Structure formats: structure tokens, C-alpha cells
């Protein structure tokens, strides 16, 4: 099933790229972004629509947890709407920040009301009872995961490789704990096929349609499996990318000084001379190593 999803996406992406070019469904580069990205203007976007929809299809066939599929669908709608508005308006502005945050929060709340998770967390072997505060924590996990993957999607191939480098080890970790969430691998197969066309020079971008959905799925899975804190270790790069934005904004507002040349962090490395390929390679290897270290520490691999 995983191989079938990979092959299906590999076959369909060239068709989708041609269709999007014909329909002029292209990326609009934000003005405050690096000047180095100007040549990417017009590259087909919303490419995540394919690996998400095929992932949803194979997820239903594989009897993936209904709540995961629902979360996947809700966050897909948010990402799709954001990209759609950007294409229609012919600029980089889709949903406004507060609109996106509101929709993500509402989606996460719907998920939590339906899931009704236990209110304890596993803090690396120690069980902590959070009571009603857990719902706020879980809300932050789901929305934060969605935004973190969205922030990571700024270079050709980056978000895709980070997802693959973290989701496969994460699947093995969950399997060791007696939990099977094959949607992680099913989506990973689609993302791998997508990367054939997204690695530099990208022929298509996943857009918010892809990145917001991937992050939403990861957050939902972590809440369902009570592995919220472990998720951070399998996806350290998105966490670091998010922290770089928070620190940059906070530093500028309080001290009127920037810590990085630009945030998220991958843009900082671009502006100090690193090539996109180098940044993607270093970030991916770092994320993969951190994931493998987690598997080693918790005895998943000998």
C-alpha cells in the first residue's frame, strides 16, 4: 500500500505540474523574503493536494484512526483555502495570520472534543496529570505542529525531507509502543514522490495545502498516542525554526535588534552564503540523527 501510494504520486505529479502551469496556479513570492527567491515566482504551488488526497484514500483503506483522518481533512481545508486565496489574489497573501490561527484553533478544538483524550502526559517515562490544563496543552501541540511545518517549508525540498526524516523513525517508535499509525508512512511515501519534483530546482511547491496538513497530522497523532513530548525530539528542526521566529520577533519588539539576519532560521543561513542544497542536507541530517538518537535511547534500535 505504501509502495502503491509512492508509485501513484510519482505517476500523477508530472500531470499535475502541467495542469497547474496551464492554469497558472503559481507561487507568488513575498516581498519581505530573500531576494534570492525571485526566480521562483510562478512555480506551480499547492502540490500538497496530491499527496494529501492520495494519503487520505490509502489511509481509509488501511483503516487509519478516524480521528487522524478527520484532523488531516480539517487542516487540509485550511491550507487549501490559504493557497487558493493567494492564487486568486495573485500575491503571496492568502489568509491573514489571525484568520489562519483562528481556523487552526477551531480545528484543533473540534479534534479534542471528539477525541476526549486522557488528561495525563508522558514526560519521558514520567506520567504527569494535567487535569483540564491538558486541553490547552494539546491545543498548542496540534496548532504548533501545524505552524512549525508551515514555517519549515521555505526552501526547495526542506519541509518534505524533514517530514520523511522524522516520520519514519517516529513510526518505528510508536510501533515499539504497540501503536500502529501507518498514515505516517503512507503520507511519507507520497512526500517522497513529491520530492522528486520538489528538490532544487523545484518544479512544484507543496504550499500550505501540504505543510499545514503534515503538521496537523503529526500533532493529532502525538495527542492520540500520548507522545507529545517525544514528537519534539523527532522533529527538532521545525521546533528550532519556530523558536527562531519567536526569538526574532521578541528581540525586535523589546530591544529593537534582530538576532538573525532573517527568520525562520533557514533564511539566516541563506543570507550568510549557504546554498539551499547545503541547508536542506544539513538540516535533514541533523533531524535524522536526533530521531535515531531517540530510538537508541528508548531501545527501539540496538
Curated annotation (Swiss-Prot):
Pathway: Cell wall biogenesis; peptidoglycan biosynthesis. Coiled coil: none annotated. Its EC number is 2.7.8.13. Catalyzes the initial step of the lipid cycle reactions in the biosynthesis of the cell wall peptidoglycan: transfers peptidoglycan precursor phospho-MurNAc-pentapeptide from UDP-MurNAc-pentapeptide onto the lipid carrier undecaprenyl phosphate, yielding undecaprenyl-pyrophosphoryl-MurNAc-pentapeptide, known as lipid I. It is a multi-pass membrane protein. Its main location: membrane. Disulfide bonds: none annotated. This is Phospho-N-acetylmuramoyl-pentapeptide-transferase. One of its GO terms (cellular component) is plasma membrane. Keywords: Cell cycle, Cell division, Cell inner membrane, Cell membrane, Cell shape, Cell wall biogenesis/degradation, Magnesium, Membrane, Metal-binding, Peptidoglycan synthesis, Transferase, Transmembrane, Transmembrane helix. The chain crosses the membrane at residues 1-21, 42-62, 68-88, 123-143, 154-174, 178-198, 204-224, 229-249, 279-299. Pfam families: Glycos_transf_4 (PF00953), MraY_sig1 (PF10555). CDD domains: GT_MraY. InterPro entries: Glycosyl_transferase_4, PNAcMuramoyl-5peptid_Trfase, PNAcMuramoyl-5peptid_Trfase_CS. Its cofactor is Mg(2+). One of its GO terms (biological process) is cell wall organization. One of its GO terms (molecular function) is phospho-N-acetylmuramoyl-pentapeptide-transferase activity. It catalyses: UDP-N-acetyl-alpha-D-muramoyl-L-alanyl-gamma-D-glutamyl-meso-2,6-diaminopimeloyl-D-alanyl-D-alanine + di-trans,octa-cis-undecaprenyl phosphate = di-trans,octa-cis-undecaprenyl diphospho-N-acetyl-alpha-D-muramoyl-L-alanyl-D-glutamyl-meso-2,6-diaminopimeloyl-D-alanyl-D-alanine + UMP.
